[in-house]
Swiss-Prot record:
A motif (DEAH box) lies at residues 225-228. It comes from Escherichia coli (strain K12). This is ATP-dependent DNA helicase YoaA. The keyword Disulfide bond does not apply. It holds the Pfam family Helicase_C_2. DNA-dependent ATPase and 5'-3' DNA helicase. Has single-stranded (ss)DNA-dependent ATPase activity and 5'-3' helicase activity on forked DNA; both activities were measure in a YoaA:HolC (chi) complex. Requires a 20-35 nucleotide (nt) 5'-ssDNA tail; dsDNA with a 20 nt gap is also unwound. Unwinds damaged 3' nascent ends (such as those terminated by 3' azidothymidine (AZT), 3' dideoxy-C or an abasic site on the translocating strand), to promote repair and AZT excision. Without HolC the protein has much lower activity which could be due to YoaA instability or helicase stimulation by HolC. The gene is yoaA. Its cofactor is [4Fe-4S] cluster; Mg(2+). SMART domains: DEXDc, HELICc2. Keywords: ATP-binding, DNA damage, DNA repair, DNA-binding, Helicase, Hydrolase, Iron, Iron-sulfur, Isomerase, Metal-binding, Nucleotide-binding, SOS response. ATP binds at A45, G46, T47, G48, T49, G50, K51, T52. Residues 10-272 form the Helicase ATP-binding domain.
Length: 636
């Protein structure tokens, strides 16, 4: 490999401010060798290694077909619009590059047209968004909905004007030649480097979604960034699920077919109404939102059983009625195919005694999902890798537990892979301090949020905000935010009150804010400099013991003679904590304090595993020392 990473290499010459880093060069060498030998490679690269450039440069130099997959759409967009162009330009790369997302990320012109025709039946706000989207549809080049600023990202119009694998009419669609998904796929087929995300990669490999399936067999190199998310995402795709959103979409499409093309078939409207009603009734039976529970236990309840049977019957009715009008409307024909698919899925979900699977359900305020997930995806993922010879490269800042990658590789069935553990080049002994508070209030006791907020207030105020408070539950997040707002004058931002992107923008522009958040801010958030110099974590992030997926994995581990705590719960929590901690120091000049409000870190034997997996920062139990550390001005 020409040494692109040397002080006088291509990257240093072409990229302003590029500083050579030894761990980055080591990773680039390992990636180059893995590509040349066509063998798997697993790399944990600590924050600040510069892992993106370390895999991009060798991948572009290899002149092979490359798929790069990310855990989040945010990183996918950043790679495609920022990192890839920068490295391509530096290396004078002349190949074609494409971005490909799942089809629900693109505007569907046919569904937009159908909604505009059904306009009078839509609520006013949705109708006004549909009108805005019609005007946007004439301006957009790629139809990527993340680039539309005129309609809010949580607008209820989006599911109506985007397609899913289930409701797409495919080549029968009157808008097929202008279809944004088809254009994006064609571009990806012709490209040398394609940027996708894990959801799309796995959906394609498992479901063989038409079109994209032809793209992957040709790839010589598969690179997974944020690879720590792969095992959980893979388990979703190797299982099956059915959601109320899918059923309500089906009912809507049957209604549109009746109102536009099949006005003589009133039965269609009746069966669509009954399906929508039974889906909503079933959601009401499930109770509180935000809960993930055991489907086997749920279906033992006679009341739920009755609602489930009713759902099954109305789906059956839609299938029978749609069958009578086959061949008269492309929209209804597609709806019939979905009804067939959903009947099969519902049947699988009813057979709750299949061993080797976890059966679970989840509900939000308006919707529910019923799902079955395999307990282990190792064999299936191993099979997948065997079918696709080439280099499989997995990287993330958080793959190891106590300097061991086995937890990650065993979950994906990765064998005989080269592995590399690269520590962060940051000087944590100078840049950071870890504080585990003394005299913490008893968790889950009434008033614990009030006491904790009172303990934390002095350090947050001494730091003039500039703080992330990361919580392990929504309830704690809301309670703490309420306490902070009642007792502090600093701006307190709360996750969920606006979109993630806007919250981050508000946090950065305020310059003295406290952001109280939960899971989605634990990873993939990059705030550099003095804007963020304090990260507080309310407790060690063990997954709730009631979570059916966790329970099932623990049971599977027990049956194999393992220790569920040591092999499942502890490693999962360590990886999550490492992600949260990684929010603090993002640059060589950053300084900050990490506060963990959980005595178990120092009182329980397993605390040592957590500490051994964290960056080597000095530790204290004295909050006054943490306040003094924050008072020292940074070297910026």
């Amino acid at each position: 490999m020409t040494d692109d990473f040397a002080p006088d290499g291509q990257l240093a010459k072409a990229i302003p401010g590029f500083k050579p880093r030894e761990p980055q060069r080591q990773m680039a060498v390992a990636v180059t060798q893995a590509i040349e030998k066509g063998q798997p490679l697993v790399v944990e690269a600590g924050t600040g290694t510069g892992k993106t450039y370390a895999y991009l440069a060798p991948a572009l130099r290899a002149k092979k077909k490359v798929i790069i997959s990310t855990g989040s759409k945010a990183l996918q967009d950043q790679l495609y619009s920022r990192d890839l162009p920068t490295v391509s330009k530096a290396l004078k790369y002349t190949g074609n590059v494409a971005l490909l997302k799942g089809r629900s990320n693109y505007l569907c012109l046919e569904r937009l047209e159908q909604q505009a025709l059904a306009g009078g039946d839509l609520p006013v706000q949705i109708l006004s968004d549909v009108i805005l989207l019609r005007s946007w549809s004439n301006q957009t080049v790629d139809g990527d909905i993340s680039t539309c600023v005129s309609v809010a990202e949580d607008s209820q119009a989006w599911p109506l004007v985007t397609s899913t694998n289930d409701n797409c009419l495919g080549s029968d669609c009157p808008m097929y030649k202008d279809c944004f998904v088809v254009k994006a796929r064609k571009k990806a087929m012709d490209a040398d480097v394609v940027v996708v995300n894990h959801h799309l990669f796995l959906a394609d490999m498992v479901v063989k979604e038409s079109g994209f399936g032809e793209l992957i067999p040709e790839a010589d190199v598969m690179i997974f960034d944020e690879a720590h998310q792969l095992p959980d995402i893979a388990s979703q795709y190797f299982g099956q699920s059915l959601s109320s959103r899918q059923l309500l979409d089906l009912a809507k499409d049957i209604t549109i077919a009746y109102r536009t093309e099949l006005k003589d078939t009133q039965q269609l409207q009746k069966c669509a109404d009954r399906l929508a009603q039974s889906a909503q009734d079933f959601r009401l039976q499930l109770g509180e939102p935000g809960y993930r529970g055991n489907l086997r236990e749920l279906l033992a309840n006679p009341q739920i059983q009755r609602a489930f049977l009713l759902l099954d019957d109305t789906l059956e009715l839609c299938y029978d009625v749609a069958k009578l009008s086959l061949g008269r409307s492309a929209l209804l024909d597609a709806a019939f195919e979905r009804a067939t698919l959903y009947r099969t899925r519902l049947k699988r979900l009813k057979e709750i005694n299949q061993p080797g699977y976890s059966y679970w359900y989840e509900c939000t305020s308006r919707h529910f999902t019923l799902a079955l997930t395999p307990l282990s995806v190792a064999d299936k993922f191993k099979e997948l890798m065997a079918q696709k010879p080439g280099s499989w490269i997995f990287t993330s800042a958080t793959l190891s537990v106590n300097d061991d990658l086995h937890h990650f590789t065993s979950r994906l069935g990765i064998e005989q892979a080269e592995s590399l553990l690269l520590p962060s080049p940051f000087d944590y002994s100078r840049q950071a301090l870890l504080c585990v508070l003394r005299n913490l209030p008893q968790t889950n006791q009434p008033g614990s949020a009030r006491q904790l907020a009172a303990m934390l207030r002095p350090i947050i105020e001494a730091n003039n905000g500039r703080c992330f408070m990361l919580c392990t539950s929504h309830a704690m997040m809301r309670d703490l935010a309420e306490q902070f707002r009642a007792t502090m004058t600093l701006p307190v931002l709360l996750q969920g009150e606006t979109s993630k992107g806007q919250l981050l923008q508000q946090f950065v522009s305020a310059g003295n804010a406290l952001l109280v958040a939960t899971s989605s801010f634990w990873e993939g958030v990059d705030v550099r400099g003095d804007t963020l110099s304090l990260v507080i974590i309310d407790k060690l992030p063990f997954t709730s013991p009631d979570d059916p997926l966790l329970k099932a994995r623990m049971e599977d581990c027990r049956l194999r003679g393992g220790d569920p705590f040591d092999e499942v719960q502890l490693p999962d929590a360590v990886i999550t904590l490492k992600q949260g901690v990684g929010r603090l120091i993002r640059d060589a000049d950053d300084r900050g304090v990490l506060v963990i409000c959980d005595n178990r870190l120092v009182m329980r034997p397993y605390g040592a595993t957590f500490l051994a997996s964290l960056p080597p920062a000095p530790r204290t139990r004295d909050i006054a020392r943490a306040v003094r550390f924050l008072a020292i001005p940074s070297s910026r």
